[in-house]
Amino acid sequence: MIDREWMLEAYRLTRKDGAPGIDGVTAADYEANLEANLDDLQARIKSGRYVAPPVRRHYIPKADGTQRPLGIPTLEDKVAQRVILLLLEPVYETDFLPCSYGFRPGRSAHDALLALRAGFMSEGLRWVVDIDISKYFDTIDHTHLRGFLDRRVTDGVVRKMIDKWLKAGVLEQGVLSNRVSSAVRPEGHPKAA
């Protein structure tokens, strides 16, 4: 299912302007041998030899003075995540409600704001509740997540990749922790990566 065209498309769609992950590899470095790198990545994914590298922890300041931790994946991991997204997106996209905007094709935060504004204008609403759900990801039960995936994702390669990402660690100041939590979630989503 994953072929060279999928790999090239995944690379094309991956943001390449972000900071490098723990390997220090930039887009320019990776592109120096792009076809060979993508062929090697494809072979490792399909054979099960792909190892999800730890993400590099980085903090960004928030408006309230606190810091938001991010996990910065390697460029190659972003490409691997993107190729799996390309496979899963058509499977799950039809399940989403029209009022859902997060990380969906053809939708943006600006679209969500426009819909919110239109709803406020037509309904005469006056309140907005701002909720930060970032801590929610700390509580996701991986067994439940795997059960959810079991219902529609039967491809062993895809399942193994997801399991590897769920177990990937975090590198902070030279210290490796065993598991990613939302407190150190990978930067956004493959679409943002």
Can you name each region flagged by the protein language model?
Residues 5-8, 24, 28, 39, ...:
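Non-catalytic, well-ordered alpha-helical scaffold segments
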Residues 1-5, 78, 90-91, 139, ...:
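Residues at alpha-helix boundaries and the short loops/turns that link adjacent helices
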Residues 2-18, 55-59, 85-91, 170-173:
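Short, compositionally biased low-complexity segments
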Residues 67-96, 183-193:
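Conserved pre-motif C helix in the palm subdomain of viral-like polymerases
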Residues 20, 25, 67, 131, ...:
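Single, functionally critical "micro-switch" positions that shape active/binding sites
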Residues 37, 44-59, 63, 95-193:
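Conserved polymerase palm-domain catalytic core
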Residues 1-47:
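Surface-exposed loop/turn segments and immediately adjacent short secondary-structure elements
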